[in-house]
Amino acid sequence: TKLNNTDTIECNIKYDNSESCIRKYNILRESLKNHKMKNMEYRISLLKKLLELWDKYENLVNKSNLLHLGQSEVISSMYSYAIIRKEITYAISNLNKWVKPIKCDTPLFIGYADSYVIPEPFGLTLIFSAWNCNFLNLFVPLIQAIAAGNLCLWKPASMSPETCKVCLMILNEMPGDVVQSCAGKRLFLEGISLP
């Protein structure tokens, strides 16, 4: 379909206040306790779901880039869509290698033993999106955080409402105990003050 920059994207954004942002943060903190993000197969299934959603919303990604940045469909497909799609497929294909224990030297004072570095999730990540390249600033850290086994709280840029709408449409189809978003104009300080 031919895109023009006079349309808008139909989506009702529900802006959060600081209480709902804290509630979403607490949902993610509670879901940390079940340790399901330590399961590599679960992480791969989340990345595959994200890839499926990314493909599903390709036209809206291109349309929002046209409306917000004035990018043509070709440029948007090459930069926003293709880069993020490649990032997801790269994470899926390499996750097995990334989670393997890494053998390392054992200190002499420990004696005869084998030592390994075992990759573990850190827990909860907070992602802020910039107004000028919202898709890359959201999805690249999101993909890496999910691959690492972390949960994500996302604060979209309020200066790019069309892009924010598409991102919210995609993230709302992801499991709510893995990804949450706090959309609002003055939630920056609330986001960085969370424990």
Residues covered by each model-derived region:
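Rossmann-like NAD(P) dinucleotide-binding subdomain of oxidoreductase/dehydrogenase enzymes
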Residues: 106-195
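N-terminal Rossmann-like NAD(P)+-binding subdomain of aldehyde/semialdehyde dehydrogenases
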Residues: 1-116
